[in-house]
Amino acid sequence: EFDWRNFNFNTKVRDQGDCGSCWAITVAGALEGQAYWYNRKNIELSPQELVDCSRKDHGCGGGWFESAFEYVANKPDQWLAPESKYSYLNRQQECDANARRSNTCDFSDQPDLYKLKCTGSRQLPYDNEDALKEALIIHGPVPVAIHVTPDLYMYSSGVYTDRTCVKTAL
C-alpha cells in the first residue's frame, strides 16, 4: 500500500489566511512534491509568485491550476522562486520582476533541482479514482479541488462530509 507519509516528504502546511490563494498554494505544493519525488529533497516554493504574477489568474480572488502551471511552464527557467526569496504575504501585490527572469531559482545548495522543469499539466479524467492513484504513484502529489459550502467553515476534525455536495467537475 502506497503512503506518502513513508517518504519523509515534509514541507510546511500553509495557511492561506484571508487571501483566496488555495490554487497557488496547491500548485506550489504539487511542484514541491514532484521535486521531492524526483530528487528526494524537501524544498519550499513560492505560492506568492503565482498570486502576484500569474496574469490569467486573479490573485487573492482565486485562480486555476491549469493557468498556474502554464505560468510556470512559460517562465524562462520553468520553475517557481523559492519561498525564502519570495515569501507568502496573505495579500496580492505587484509582481516582483525578478521572479519573471531566468535563474530566479537559487537552489545553489541543491544543484540537482536546476534539472527540474515544469513543462505543463494535464487534467485527469473526472471521477476516476484509479487515474488519480496512478498519477500519485508515478508523478507525486497532484492538485485537487473541492467546492466549498458554508458547512466547511464549521468543520473542526475528522472526515468532512457535505450532504449538499453535488458530484460535478469544478
PLM features: residue spans?
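Catalytic-core signature of thiol
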Residues: E1-L170
